[in-house]
Regions:
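N-terminal low-complexity segments that are often proline-rich with Ser/Thr-Pro
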Residues: 285-287
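Acidic, proline/glycine-enriched N-terminal capping motif
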Residues: 1-75, 80-82
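Well-ordered mid-protein domain cores that form the structural environment of catalytic cofactors
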Residues: 63-93, 98-113
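Conserved, structured C-terminal
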Residues: 1-21, 91-283
């Protein structure tokens, strides 16, 4: 559907730049919460689920443990980056894939096409769950303290919920999925609940987070934070780039096959061209 998200949460007479800078700085110093419900979500189930992921992503997926997430890059047949995102192994034959908001429908169609016409032998079912789950990203140095208050019966310590880890928890009587994933470079988590409880989740996060100086942040601050982290998104994945353009060559397997692998070997793609480069700023939003 058509998603609407605030670019920033205005205070007083703030303009976009002032408001987003305040929000980003608060994430760097305290804790912030951002609505990430718009991310595409796809349930992948079946004994061949891992094999499907291994074929559509450029990196390896056959040995991902239950309760862990992994970042992956998906290519078109011509080698161009189609999408990126994290996929979590919920149980033995059950995976939860997230996609970018813009490519959610295209990725689902991509998977269905290959399962129906190219790999009909794979025993896998894929279904969109984008509208079934509401999501909130909780980011900042105080995010774990807040999470422990939200889920007092869960071990969200570094040992109990390591980076790229997953667990289920009870959010004041509501079943929740908890992922330790960061889009900002700070300690961060994503919490998902059934969409009917989305407002309830948001209100509880704001209420409990008051003692940690929580502030909601919009898409403008989100973009600023991800740029500072060096995470690719948006203009770097505009349908004209390959993994090597975005410093993602470490995710391209040299052993296994995947969609788009042969195209990456074309001379036009192996020659030096554009390169993803980080710049050190004199002042970041957190200073």
């Amino acid at each position: 559907g058509v998603w609407l998200r605030p670019r920033y949460y205005k205070r007083g007479n703030e303009n976009l730049f002032e408001g987003s800078k305040r929000e980003a700085k608060n994430v760097r110093t305290n804790v912030g919460v951002c609505d990430v419900t718009t991310l595409g979500k796809i349930d992948i189930k079946g004994p061949d689920a891992a094999e499907l992921l291994n074929r559509v992503y450029t990196n390896a997926w056959l040995k991902l443990p239950v309760g862990k997430a992994r970042y992956g890059v998906m290519l078109r047949e011509d080698g161009i980056v189609m999408d990126d995102g994290t996929t979590t192994r919920i149980s033995e034959n059950h995976y939860h894939m997230t996609t970018t908001t813009a490519q959610a429908a295209n990725v689902l169609s991509h998977l269905e096409y290959y399962l129906q016409l190219v790999w009909p032998e794979l025993n896998v079912n894929v279904v969109s769950t984008t509208e079934q789950w509401a999501g909130a990203a909780i980011a900042g140095p105080k995010s774990r303290d807040l999470l422990q208050k939200l889920f007092p019966n869960s071990d969200v310590s570094n040992e109990g919920l390591p980076f790229m880890g997953y667990m289920e928890g009870d959010l004041f009587g509501v079943k929740a999925r908890i992922y330790r994933i960061s889009f900002s470079g700070e300690l961060a988590y994503e919490v998902n609940v059934e969409s009917d409880y989305g407002n309830f989740m948001w209100e509880k996060i704001i209420e409990v987070g008051e003692e940690f100086n929580i502030q909601p942040y919009g898409t403008e601050a989100l973009s600023t934070l991800r740029i500072e982290m060096g995470h690719v998104a948006g203009s770097e994945l505009d349908g004209r780039t390959i993994p090597f353009d975005n410093a993602l060559e470490g995710l391209v397997s040299k052993k296994k096959d995947f969609i788009g692998k042969r195209s990456l070997q074309r001379s036009a793609f192996t020659a030096e061209a554009v390169s993803y480069t980080h710049l050190r700023a004199h002042e970041t939003v957190g200073n």
